[in-house]
Amino acid sequence: IIINTILLINAISSVDDLIILFETKNSINISGYLNTKSQIIIDEKIHKGNSYQQSLVLDDFFDVSDVDRFKVIHRGGSENNLIYILGEYSSNTDIYKVLITLTKSEKELTIKKIKIDKKL
């Protein structure tokens, strides 16, 4: 029980760290949670690639959308070590819905998908 609690605390801390990276729009460090199987989907366009290429996709989104705030709406987990974060990026004129899904192994969190859609 103690080991499971320690693993859960470490995973929660890592999720909190990841949320801070999204709040600060730190695409380079966000890309450290990505791998070549990860997807970034922005307004239905799917982006794949290595972590550097994916960091450029996020940089482009941050520059073009001019978002300045990230707010977590809900976060949770499910069976099979799947963790999700629902959030919103907002600018002065637009709001973007964000869904981040992650998998947790014994040693790390990996982003499976980042889905960003402009709210109409």
Regions found by a protein language model. Give the residues of each.
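Bacterial N-terminal signal peptides
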Residues: 1-7
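Short, aromatic-enriched amphipathic alpha-helices that serve as compact interaction elements
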Residues: 11-26
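Exposed acidic/polar residues on beta-strands and adjacent loops within beta-sheet cores, strongest
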Residues: 28, 47, 71-81, 117-120
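Short solvent-exposed beta->alpha transition segments
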Residues: 32-71
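Hydrophobic residues embedded in beta-strands of well-ordered beta-sheets
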Residues: 38, 81-83, 107-110
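Mature soluble domains of exported/periplasmic/lumenal proteins and thiol-rich metal-chelating peptides
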Residues: 52-53, 68, 75, 109, ...
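Short beta-strand edge/turn micro-motifs at domain boundaries
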Residues: 93-120
